[in-house]
């Protein structure tokens, strides 16, 4: 029962216990993580090709991901708008010129291309490709170890997290409203509650959530989680500039775990420098919770 939990948490914790001071080593780890994400998504695509009843399973993936992201985002937006009304976050910043949102979206969609390539190769049916699942398990353990090191050495201290009240509050609201959305999805999609809650715990970190859920629930749920969280990032990129004028909390919350990296430039240019600390704290908390919550619900 707890083997899946241990596979996720042990390498993550061991990595988190390792302090690194050399920036060169951290750059190497970041590059390795990028390559390993592509590798595991490639394995995910191969695993999809070996599914029985392939056509019906692909329709199930599309159905699960479309319903899931719609319900979760609606729950997030409702809760974050309520937060903004009760605890306003004033915006006095004049928006700067934004980075190309099309270029950012294409960068995200490259990961979809890796899954598609793996799927196409898997359709060849070569016998050795059936070991893709085992290969992804070993790669996942190393990836989680490196993620632990990355989280430990990203410059955030406990004091900084505690002091940034807005980032913490928005993160809590996102977690609670996402899990409520997960419960609703369990009812709508007729999924086990723990499966739906695990799918709701990706918070936009599609490269990790898809991998972890494939390991725990199989390639159908894992792929649905991947597209669910990828859609969250793409939607956030498109909505932030217009939304941030009305509700800064909602704009930040929609970014999920990506607010500390991928969507941070958009948040900074549209919301100002005072939004950066909250965005980093918010993204850090959610990034830390993704593997923990998924491991918990998977067990």
Curated annotation (Swiss-Prot):
One of its GO terms (cellular component) is plasma membrane. The keyword Ubl conjugation does not apply. Induction: Repressed by arginine, via the ArgR repressor. Keywords: Amino-acid transport, Cell inner membrane, Cell membrane, Membrane, Transmembrane, Transmembrane helix, Transport. Pfam families: Lys_export. GO terms for biological process: L-lysine transmembrane transport. InterPro entries: LysO. GO terms for molecular function: L-lysine efflux transmembrane transporter activity. Signal peptide: none annotated. The chain crosses the membrane at residues 1-21, 31-51, 58-78, 109-129, 131-151, 169-189, 207-227, 277-297. Disruption phenotype: Null mutant is hypersensitive to the lysine antimetabolite thialysine. The keyword Transmembrane helix applies. It is a multi-pass membrane protein. It is found in: Cell inner membrane. Coiled coil: none annotated. Belongs to the LysO family. Mediates export of lysine. This is Lysine exporter LysO. It comes from Escherichia coli (strain K12).
């Amino acid at each position: 029962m707890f083997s899946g939990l241990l596979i996720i948490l042990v390498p993550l914790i061991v990595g988190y216990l390792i302090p690194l001071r050399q920036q060169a080593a951290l750059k190497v780890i970041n590059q390795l993580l990028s390559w390993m994400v592509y590798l595991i998504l490639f394995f995910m695509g191969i695993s999809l090709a070996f599914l029985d009843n392939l056509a019906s399973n692909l329709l199930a993936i599309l159905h699960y991901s479309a319903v899931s992201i719609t319900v979760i985002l609606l729950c997030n937006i409702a809760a974050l708008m309520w937060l903004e009304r009760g605890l306003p976050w004033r915006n006095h910043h004049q928006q700067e010129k934004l980075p190309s949102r099309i270029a950012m979206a294409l960068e995200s969609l490259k990961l979809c291309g890796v899954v598609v390539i793996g799927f196409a190769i898997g359709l060849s049916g070569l016998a050795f490709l059936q070991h893709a699942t085992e290969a992804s398990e070993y790669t996942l353990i190393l990836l989680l170890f490196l993620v632990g090191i990355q989280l430990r050495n990203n410059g955030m201290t406990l004091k900084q997290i505690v002091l940034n009240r807005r980032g913490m509050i928005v993160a809590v609201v996102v977690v609670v409203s996402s899990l409520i959305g997960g419960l609703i999805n369990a009812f709508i999609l007729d999924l086990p509650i723990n499966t739906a809650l695990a799918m709701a715990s990706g918070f936009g970190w599609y490269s990790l959530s898809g991998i972890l859920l494939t390991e725990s629930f199989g390639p159908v749920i894992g792929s649905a989680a991947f597209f669910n969280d990828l859609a969250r990032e793409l939607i956030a990129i498109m909505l932030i500039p217009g939304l941030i004028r009305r509700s800064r909390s909602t704009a930040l919350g929609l970014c999920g775990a990506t607010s500390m990296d991928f969507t941070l430039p958009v948040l900074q240019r549209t919301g100002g420098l005072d939004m950066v600390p909250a965005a980093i704290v918010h993204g850090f908390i959610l990034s830390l919770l993704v593997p923990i919550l998924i491991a918990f619900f998977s067990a």
